[in-house]
């Protein structure tokens, strides 16, 4: 979805240029303002996600992996069966 949004938002309509906004009908002006807000929000989300990815990558690199060479014996999860009894 991010690729689709980037392609759409990167090419705002020429009618939404600040020089043309005064000449536009109010409804079209509202659409242009909404598109501008969506573009700003999208770029802020991309920068936030980029910051999070950098933080997570650094966090994972700082944790050493434990490799004892022994298969784990503990129970990590429980399988539950739902439905009718046979």
From Swiss-Prot:
Subcellular location: Secreted
GO CC, alphabetical: extracellular region
Taxonomic superkingdom: Eukaryota
Record key words, sorted: Amidation, Cleavage on pair of basic residues, Neuropeptide, Pyrrolidone carboxylic acid, Secreted, Signal
Keyword Zinc-finger: no
Residues recorded as bearing Phenylalanine amide in the entry: 82
Signal sequence annotation: 1-18
GO biological process: neuropeptide signaling pathway
Subcellular location, principal: secreted
Positions of the propeptide removed during maturation: 19-70
Residues bearing the modification Pyrrolidone carboxylic acid: 73
Function: Myoinhibiting neuropeptide.
Protein family per UniProt: Belongs to the myosuppressin family.
The name this protein goes by in its record: Myosuppressin
Source species: Apis mellifera (Honeybee)
